[in-house]
Amino acid sequence: MEQNVLNTDLTGKVAVVTGASGTLCSIFAKALARAGAKVALLGRNMEKLKALADEIEAEGGIARGYTCNVMNKANCLQVAEDVMAELGSCDILVNGAGGNNARANTDKEYFEMADLEDDTVTFFDLDESGVEMVFDLNFIGTLLPTQAFARQMVGRPGCNILNISSMNAYLPLTKIPAYSGSK
């Protein structure tokens, strides 16, 4: 197994990572496994989750993939039960699922009055359903897994919840207002 970059021993702990098949969260999942945690990999694509679990297990870690829609409470609650039955109670929750939608973006970084007269997509043209999808994914998609897994953590010392955000929360980009606002 590769180096434990977390410099801590998580042996016996169960870590749950949403958005686990994504670029950042797959690295978080590997790091948690290298520190000794059993890792529940949550995401939409079981093929990618299985490949990541196989990679972690090839290094000597313990990982299982679970298909989960973080915007569906019943699904989150069921997956929380499944993880507890298979790996144990959640000690660490990493909320990493998130994203953007092209229908919630503008075409340009800066608004100019002439943009109203041409085909440029401005703030005034943003698609409401695209904006709602981004807010649901980035907010509800953190809320529901937290509700599902935090029940297993309440009253147990040493449990942690990490919510992955974005620098856009601090320095919003004008071209992606829904994403920046939801972070």
Regions found by a protein language model. Name each.
Residues 96-119:
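Conserved NAD(P)H cofactor-binding loop of Rossmann-fold oxidoreductase domains
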Residues 14, 21-23:
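Conserved glycine-rich cofactor-binding loop
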Residues 112-143, 162:
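Catalytic Tyr-X3-Lys loop
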Residues 166:
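Residue(s) in the substrate-gating loop at a strand-loop-helix junction
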Residues 172-180:
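Active-site loop-to-helix junction immediately N-terminal to the catalytic Tyr of the SDR YXXXK motif
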Residues 37-51:
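Conserved glycine-rich Rossmann-like NAD(P)H-binding loop of the short-chain dehydrogenase/reductase
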Residues 146, 182:
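Active-site helix of classical SDR
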